[in-house]
């Protein structure tokens, strides 16, 4: 009864929670297994951000429930789906023995002890707790990179987003605690630190009454073993001149930013309640572009309620004009409990998918042209693996799992975690080929 497996779905922020649960379980003598068939207990850390994520979470619960016919004794759901559907989830999915919300995952050991006694456990309704400080992590990423969560929750009130209800209001972690965790990760061999939160750029606003991300980055860059610091989930309205200067002048911060913009049309931004304007977005992009070698990733949403052909055309032209190196396009997901749920008219699924496809076609060409422009240049690559006779890794331009890869041809023996400087010799739509 000591084998536990965790399946972590959704975003990297969820992965960090899973890593903390793993550490708590290991501390109490549980064996962590990667093969679900060998597990006595399976924990599914769920996502419920959009419809597809909910479906995936439910499919995993049903699929893992099948294992109860064999070795598996207990099945537990944690994370956003649990927080959102709590009682309904445990009622509709009888294979679940426990449902734990986002603020209660630190009680995982006690919950397992409870279900062993034959009880069904339901814990939710505390998303505002920030009670996981000081809990170690068992990394589920390769040893050379790790995510560093600097805040929990979100106080932005975007009309399409359920996250504030599932994760509570914005809560920055104390800077000294973040630094301590980063030092510990670096001691364990982490070379790339990826900064995450629902909104990284709001860091400090609640705790220190001012935006403190530039200072935090400055402190993190003093950690000797770290080579790359990467920033994800930046919001345009909080990208200050001070932050831009820090990114520009700090050698350890990679010249890459993930800045979800969602739309370009003033009227759509207003309906989305994004708290920013087209002018502000244009200003921020222009300032970020002043940083040599800057690579920008963004995400856009199509099919938001009431999105007209004109508003969509505006977005198309914006993408063509700004030529972002990395773009993700989502179709709007109508979520109960959000303001946009009641907005009219809702856009037909067929139209949403067509718009998504159109944008991705435009972006594919932009990405290809950008990659082609890299042929003949030198790039530093973090090696991640070897397959079919070639190494592969990422350059500063690529965040793990969401961006492309650099394939590296080399006669030398290379290892995951090595940094090598390659000459780019070929390019595809999303990947590069280099020689070393």
From Swiss-Prot:
Pfam families: Radical_SAM (PF04055), TRAM_2 (PF18693), UPF0004 (PF00919). One of its GO terms (biological process) is tRNA modification. [4Fe-4S] cluster 1 binds at residues 11, 47, 80. It is found in: Cytoplasm. SMART domains: Elp3. Catalyzes the methylthiolation of an aspartic acid residue of ribosomal protein uS12. Its EC number is 2.8.4.4. Binds 2 [4Fe-4S] clusters. One cluster is coordinated with 3 cysteines and an exchangeable S-adenosyl-L-methionine. Residues 140-369 form the Radical SAM core domain. It catalyses: L-aspartate(89)-[ribosomal protein uS12]-hydrogen + (sulfur carrier)-SH + AH2 + 2 S-adenosyl-L-methionine = 3-methylsulfanyl-L-aspartate(89)-[ribosomal protein uS12]-hydrogen + (sulfur carrier)-H + 5'-deoxyadenosine + L-methionine + A + S-adenosyl-L-homocysteine + 2 H(+). CDD domains: Radical_SAM (cd01335). Its cofactor is [4Fe-4S] cluster. GO terms for cellular component: cytosol. Its main location: cytoplasm. One of its GO terms (molecular function) is aspartic acid methylthiotransferase activity. Belongs to the methylthiotransferase family. RimO subfamily. Keywords: 4Fe-4S, Cytoplasm, Iron, Iron-sulfur, Metal-binding, S-adenosyl-L-methionine, Transferase. Residues 372-436 form the TRAM domain. This is Ribosomal protein uS12 methylthiotransferase RimO. InterPro entries: Elp3/MiaA/NifB-like_rSAM, Methylthiotransferase, Methylthiotransferase_CS, Methylthiotransferase_N, Methylthiotransferase_N_sf, NA-bd_OB-fold, Ribosomal_uS12_MeSTrfase_RimO, rSAM. Residues 2-117 form the MTTase N-terminal domain. [4Fe-4S] cluster 2 binds at residues 154, 158, 161.
